[in-house]
């Protein structure tokens, strides 16, 4: 999708999106190109792999990326890591310049508990550990990963599980709850996930965002952004791979 193709609705949607460049080994040139594009378009954040920090080649100290916030990930994409390993990964990202970290929660906790709707105490304990590793003012996002509970290979996450994760995030001091990255857009899936999470965190300072990574080149991407935003998503993620190669420039 080129700048010439963006109508007013698409341009307004740019303020609600973030760009993801989670290629295992993005080059410095790719990273710089995506951050610069985000800055030009008024996009608020760019996701980068933990190994990309500290980010180099984007300006002087204190004003490296302008208003663009740099986000990293930890425990990505499954969450099947010891919490201390995940916390260490998150802490290193912040120590090396990440403004925000999205941490994938342990699926054993997400789908734990006697009724498999989430082990609230275990989730709170996990998020408290992560919060200590990602101290304020850094932003801690907690996400559901791609691994489902027993008997759930794919498909939407049960509402009760989403509600438990949201409750834990509020109780343990997370800033954002992120839906699963493999939750497909469409009625009864990604939008419904966002609605459930938004209702569960209502009245708190915790916000909700979609974990589904949409294609920046998809003509319908901004329609999906609008639907997810209407459902309660504070931000939506678009894949920045094509931008880093200059195909949309």
What kind of region is each of these model predictions?
Residues 44-45:
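Periplasmic-binding protein-like
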Residues 9-41, 53-55, 60-72, 76-78, ...:
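Alpha/beta enzyme core
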Residues 1-2, 6, 10:
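Intrinsically disordered, low-complexity repeat/linker tracts enriched for polar/charged residues
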């Amino acid at each position: 999708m080129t700048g010439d193709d963006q109508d007013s609705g698409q341009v307004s949607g740019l303020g609600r999106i973030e760009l993801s460049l989670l290629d295992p080994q993005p080059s410095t040139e790719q990273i710089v190109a995506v951050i610069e594009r985000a800055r030009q378009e008024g996009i608020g954040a760019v996701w980068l792999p933990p190994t990309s920090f500290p980010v180099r080649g984007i300006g002087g100290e204190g004003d490296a990326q302008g208003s663009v916030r740099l986000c990293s990930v930890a425990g990505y994409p499954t969450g099947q890591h010891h919490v201390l390993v995940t916390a260490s990964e998150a802490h290193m990202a912040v120590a090396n310049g990440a403004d925000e970290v999205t941490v994938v929660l342990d699926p054993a906790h997400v789908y734990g508990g006697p009724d498999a709707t989430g082990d609230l105490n275990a989730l709170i304990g996990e998020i408290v550990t992560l919060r200590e590793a990602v101290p304020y003012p850094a932003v801690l996002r907690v996400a559901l990963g791609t691994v489902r509970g027993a008997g759930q290979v794919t498909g939407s996450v049960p509402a009760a599980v989403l509600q438990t994760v949201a409750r834990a995030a509020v109780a343990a001091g997370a800033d954002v709850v992120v839906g699963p990255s493999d939750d497909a857009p469409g009625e009864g899936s990604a939008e419904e996930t966002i609605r459930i999470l938004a209702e569960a965190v209502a009245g708190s300072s915790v916000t909700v965002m979609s974990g589904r990574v949409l294609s920046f080149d998809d003509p319908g991407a901004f329609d999906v952004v609008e639907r997810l935003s209407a459902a309660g998503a504070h931000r939506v993620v678009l894949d920045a791979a094509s931008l880093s190669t200059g195909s949309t420039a």
